[in-house]
Amino acid sequence: MIPFGEWLPDQSDFQNPGATIATNVIPAARGYRPFAGLTELSAAATDRLRGIYATKASDGTVLTFAGDQGKLYKLDNSDFSLDSVASGFTMTSDMNWDFVRFGDEVIAGGSDADTLQGFTIGTDSTFSAISGAPAARHLAVVRDFVVTANVTYSSNTYRSRVRWSQINDAASWTLGSAQADFQDIADAGDITGLVGGEFGVVLMEKAIARMQYVGSPLIFTFEKVETGHGCNYPNSVASLGPTQVFYLADDGFFMFDGQRSIPIGSEKVDRFFFDDLAIGSVDRISCAIDPENQVVMWGYPSLSGAGNPDRVLIYNYAVQRWSVADLEHEVLASSLTPAFSVETLDTLSSSLDGLTTSLDSRFYAGGFFQLSAGKDKKIHTVTGAPLDAVLETTEFEPATMRQSLIRGVTPYVTSRSTTPTMTVQVGSRSRQIDSPSFSTAVSLNDDNNCPARSSGRYHRVRVNVSGTWRYALGIDVDAVGMGKR
């Protein structure tokens, strides 16, 4: 079997150790799994969504919040409308909402012009400005403090400043009182990301710093554990905690482990990404983790996306493999699924057959971590029918130093209970300087063979899969040598 190996678009197609195309799939330890499309969840906001966040109340109820340029919204779990719970905000094109939870308080920020907003679970029905708090691009919770970075207050903006609340008090920000304070981090550019936990991680354009609590009088120490290198794209950060922080720099994709940055895209996808990125729209990049599939995803506008995000780069951090998906969206986010009843299912579809997510899915049970996306000003979940997948093998040479004829291909794609639709194309060329010519797509017959025919010296096989399937592993070919040319 010729496997669908690791997707390595930065390497040569000929004898590539992996796959040359892996589109609309999730990388697995062996082969690939389907990538789900979008399922519409909410009604529309006023403008495109710039952030989605979900948390649970003490009784288990899922609370979902979202924000656009001028408003914050709360999802109504009965009719899935987006109810405005605060308005009058000012966000420029490069700003997204950032949310954190501290005790029963949900805190939102992201603008240079608007003070942090607070919502007390079980008490409040709207967000309100937190008195004395700054406006901030980035938020996190570090130990017993709400921490902000890249802040604006008292009519001044401090791009390299970290400021935090009083200890165990998200509503109190008086500097010098109850350990509330700030710290400027010099000579490292703007702060572009902030991650909380037992210690904090401050990502900057030219450095990464650890924020460690030490108590009075210093409160926190800031140690630059990495200098001369940092995160250059403010909306490209997602984490599983301070020891597993994913981000994008000018030289590619990295994971920070709490002490150092490890390249995860070098000689794999970095060149592909920067060649594909619409560089004039980098402010539309977003990043989120899908814990169910153990992947981190970067949504971005490609050169064919007219400045809007239309592609997602997918990294499986468990097996350290990549893939890509074509998915139009506004923003990516990690959230929770609300619980559904028979009545609320009617708001998703007028019939069971019209539901894009299987009724067997835990999506309907509620409370599970879920990858979400904004599209058409609405919240969507990434739980729909599988997108049409395209996988392509490495380029191989069946007959050394001579032409060969491919007479048929057997794809190894598994399925549980339904039969997916599959077609196969063979791409062939006689010289490495030529572009491959692909045969007409041929369907799988009853003999488990796709009778595709193509001649050349170098071949690759493309498999197109639609419908419901489980794993795509690789292919076998029926090839015979021909005379030298």
Region annotations inferred by a language model:
Residues 1-80, 90-104, 228-244, 250-485:
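Beta-sheet repeat architectures centered on beta-propellers
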Residues 96-130:
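Hydrophobic or amphipathic alpha-helical targeting/insertion segments
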